[in-house]
Amino acid sequence: MKVVFLEDVKGQGKKGQIKEVPTGYAQNFLIKKNLAKVATAAALSEVKGQAKAKEKEEAEFLAEAKALKEVLEKDETVVEIKMKVGQTGHTFGAVDKADIAKALKSQFGLKLDKRKIQLINKIQALGTKDVPVKLHRDVTAVVKVKISEA
């Protein structure tokens, strides 16, 4: 019996997948627990419509990520963070992902999740540093962060 999976079923199929399964398994387990439904013409067209909508949404998200990458990589887009510095030139504290995200929002109005900023170690020195930002699985931007004396 052909069924369309409504949920992921371990060892059988993923949501939206169309698969041939034994009739008893389909009727007694999958359909009863609303994990799948019989693959009728209406169900198949619904799955195709959902796939198209998901593909369109993914394309829009990718386009937004590319546009944001262009904004972040402009020459005038430099995130400036001021820190207190001691007499020897060492900074008090360090700049982390949250500080960079907060500065991006306050200086440029760009709301960016701190988890997308790929800063391995906190920045503890004065100067300019390039920090990668993963906007999408295919799009990574590099933002310039300038640490200066307050």
Curated annotation (Swiss-Prot):
HAMAP family: Ribosomal_bL9 (MF_00503). One of its GO terms (molecular function) is rRNA binding. The keyword Ribosomal protein applies. The keyword Cell membrane does not apply. SUPFAM superfamilies: L9 N-domain-like (SSF55658), Ribosomal protein L9 C-domain (SSF55653). One of its GO terms (cellular component) is ribosome. Binds to the 23S rRNA. PROSITE patterns: RIBOSOMAL_L9. Keywords: Ribonucleoprotein, Ribosomal protein, RNA-binding, rRNA-binding. NCBIfam families: L9 (TIGR00158). It comes from Lactococcus lactis subsp. cremoris (strain MG1363). It comes from the Bacteria. The gene is rplI. It holds the Pfam family Ribosomal_L9_C. PANTHER family: 50S RIBOSOMAL PROTEIN L9. This is Large ribosomal subunit protein bL9.
